[in-house]
Amino acid sequence: MTVSPVALRRKTECKPHPTARYWKKCDVEALFGLPFLELVHQAAEVHRQNFNPREIQLSTLLSIKTGGCPEDCAYCPQSAHHNTNLGKEQMMDVDEIVEKAKIAKSRGASRFCMGAAWRGPKPKDVETVSAIIKAVKGLGMETCGTFGMLEEGMAEDLKEAGLDYYNHNLDTDPDRYNDIIHTRRHEDRMDTLGKVRNAGLKVCCGGIVGMNETRAERAGLIASLANLDPQPESVPINRLVKVEGTPLDDAEDLDWTEFVRTIAVARITMPQSYVRLSAGRSNMPEAMQAMCFMAGANSIFYGDKLLTTGNPDEDGDRILMEKLNLYPLQFELEGEVAEVEKASGIKVDY
């Protein structure tokens, strides 16, 4: 794939290099600066070179331990530092979690993601979530966990329990990280990601846009993700959900075209990663979501809630996928097509 020098004419001499392994921040910003339709077109081409553009991976996300987090992330209603009227709750019962996973599978989800509002788990917490992971794996689903920063040996324990993916987002541009979070450093996130990779787990790692960042700072986030080696298997792109009581509850709305640009640039720079539409999708019109899928998004969170904030319900997602002739990615053999159609309610038409 080539990028037109004319389309990239700008004051800086920096030009994007889509085949380069290392992405400079200015290279990524140059991609953001392409004419909108040209950028989406190039991202769509990259997407089709690496994926079936009609397949969408469906994940369900459940908060198994909500509220009372000691971190002070400016975007998060679960922080104990913010007055969001979200109380601290005990961890859900294992049987209740498994029942939620069964429901998610019956509705077409292939991956069950679990989140806990911790800075990091204690050894006893790892034992508890390991039992949960084993139970969910027994249902035939992929598992993903987001439990905060890990100590030595914890990633190996989670891997042994059957965890497939570990989510640990880089949140924002490293250069502004401590404008958003003061209780940890960007380097702390990188440390846990290293532990996760060394344990043989797959990585789910993305960030949040719409936190009053500049385009250059969005480029910095994407560059930091694209330069992970190897690149994340899953890249969730969150659009800030403004919650009253958080420091960012009055953030300026991110223009929809800028969000689509972010999806497109993520696809170009991380061609073999699943790019997921994550938080904020409930406020996205169908046409905007369709543009995101065209620009390379191929995964969504499926279910009416993401941790503590709203998400489109399953019926709405089924209708949208039918309109766009998309279908769930959760099978490898043609013999499983009927089972997928029955579970999701979505007609699979090759």
Swiss-Prot record:
The keyword 4Fe-4S applies. Binds 1 [4Fe-4S] cluster. The cluster is coordinated with 3 cysteines and an exchangeable S-adenosyl-L-methionine. Binds 1 [2Fe-2S] cluster. The cluster is coordinated with 3 cysteines and 1 arginine. Gene3D superfamilies: Aldolase class I (3.20.20.70). Its EC number is 2.8.1.6. Pathway: Cofactor biosynthesis; biotin biosynthesis; biotin from 7,8-diaminononanoate: step 2/2. Its cofactor is [4Fe-4S] cluster; [2Fe-2S] cluster. It comes from the Bacteria. It catalyses: (4R,5S)-dethiobiotin + (sulfur carrier)-SH + 2 reduced [2Fe-2S]-[ferredoxin] + 2 S-adenosyl-L-methionine = (sulfur carrier)-H + biotin + 2 5'-deoxyadenosine + 2 L-methionine + 2 oxidized [2Fe-2S]-[ferredoxin]. Residues 54-278 form the Radical SAM core domain. Belongs to the radical SAM superfamily. Biotin synthase family. Catalyzes the conversion of dethiobiotin (DTB) to biotin by the insertion of a sulfur atom into dethiobiotin via a radical-based mechanism. Homodimer. This is Biotin synthase. It comes from Neisseria meningitidis serogroup C (strain 053442). The gene is bioB.
